[in-house]
Amino acid sequence: MENKLLSSQEIQELRKSLPTWEEAEGKLVKRFKFTNFIEAFGFMTKIAIISESLSHHPEWTNIYSEVIIRLSTHDMGGITMLDYKLAKAIDAIKYE
């Protein structure tokens, strides 16, 4: 599958299967809350392994038990199928 910049219409259609993610400033964005820092960091570690396998890495912020993830394909200038694929994988980790 070719990685191309998705249109607004394509993003809205794909977001139907990612209802807890928002689109903001050309990125897919989601805030995750955990019980403590260890859980949050463990979650980030799992994402790091998947991200490395996809060669696609999130922009993220971690403050204690909260992780905010922003996904976009920087070299494409917006959201691509790679971001969608990573978002789906992240949700699978969180809700496994």
Swiss-Prot record:
Q: Which NCBIfam families does the entry link to?
A: PRK00823.1-2 (NF002017), PRK00823.1-3 (NF002018)
Matching entries from Gene3D superfamilies are given as:
Transcriptional coactivator/pterin dehydratase
Write down the species. Prochlorococcus marinus (strain SARG / CCMP1375 / SS120)
Claim: NAD is one of the keywords in the record: no
Q: Give the reaction(s) catalysed.
A: (4aS,6R)-4a-hydroxy-L-erythro-5,6,7,8-tetrahydrobiopterin = (6R)-L-erythro-6,7-dihydrobiopterin + H2O
Its protein name is: Putative pterin-4-alpha-carbinolamine dehydratase
Keywords from the named record:
Lyase
Q: Which GO terms describe its biological process?
A: tetrahydrobiopterin biosynthetic process
Q: Which GO terms describe its molecular function?
A: 4-alpha-hydroxytetrahydrobiopterin dehydratase activity
Q: Which family does it belong to?
A: Belongs to the pterin-4-alpha-carbinolamine dehydratase family.
Q: Which domain of life is it from?
A: Bacteria
Q: What is its EC number?
A: 4.2.1.96
